[in-house]
């Protein structure tokens, strides 16, 4: 017979179980009157990891089109009033903006991991931008 690795187990001890008080035993044997089932909850981090996998697979735009369009028009108004945009121009701006943000967050995550953390912080974004040469 082959040897198998022994694992530590909790010992049961040699003592016999003590008698429970009558009220405790009655409470345990009586069925729960409420019968309200708790909603299922995933462990912390499980849903986050699922979302990460989902969004890494997908290619669709994550910022809604109309709010992004309003933002572009608001920023453009500071430079020249009554500017008009082709819908393809707004789409190109949105593609470029989202690609930039995803790339920045990837670098930010690497900076947080380098600092032995899993949570990104503003200082990680500053470091990532500084290393890219965007901001001094």
From Swiss-Prot:
Phosphorylated to form H3S10ph. H3S10ph promotes subsequent H3K14ac formation and is required for transcriptional activation through TBP recruitment to the promoters. Mono-, di- and trimethylated by the COMPASS complex to form H3K4me1/2/3. H3K4me activates gene expression by regulating transcription elongation and plays a role in telomere length maintenance. H3K4me enrichment correlates with transcription levels, and occurs in a 5' to 3' gradient with H3K4me3 enrichment at the 5'-end of genes, shifting to H3K4me2 and then H3K4me1. Methylated by SET2 to form H3K36me. H3K36me represses gene expression. Methylated by DOT1 to form H3K79me. H3K79me is required for association of SIR proteins with telomeric regions and for telomeric silencing. Keywords: Acetylation, Chromosome, DNA-binding, Methylation, Nucleosome core, Nucleus, Phosphoprotein. The modification N6,N6-dimethyllysine is found at residues 5, 15, 28, 37, 80. GO terms for cellular component: nucleosome; nucleus. The modification N6,N6,N6-trimethyllysine is found at residues 5, 28, 37, 80. The modification Phosphoserine is found at residue 11. InterPro entries: Histone-fold, Histone_H2A/H2B/H3, Histone_H3/CENP-A. One of its GO terms (molecular function) is structural constituent of chromatin. The modification N6-methyllysine is found at residues 5, 10, 15, 19, 24, 28, 37, 80. The keyword Phosphoprotein applies. Residues 1-45 are annotated as: Disordered. Disulfide bonds: none annotated. The modification N6-acetyllysine is found at residues 10, 15, 19, 24, 28, 37, 57, 65. The keyword DNA-binding applies. It is found in: Nucleus; Chromosome. Belongs to the histone H3 family. Core component of nucleosome. Nucleosomes wrap and compact DNA into chromatin, limiting DNA accessibility to the cellular machineries which require DNA as a template. Histones thereby play a central role in transcription regulation, DNA repair, DNA replication and chromosomal stability. DNA accessibility is regulated via a complex set of post-translational modifications of histones, also called histone code, and nucleosome remodeling. The nucleosome is a histone octamer containing two molecules each of H2A, H2B, H3 and H4 assembled in one H3-H4 heterotetramer and two H2A-H2B heterodimers. The octamer wraps approximately 147 bp of DNA. This is Histone H3. It comes from Mortierella alpina (Oleaginous fungus). The gene is H3.1.
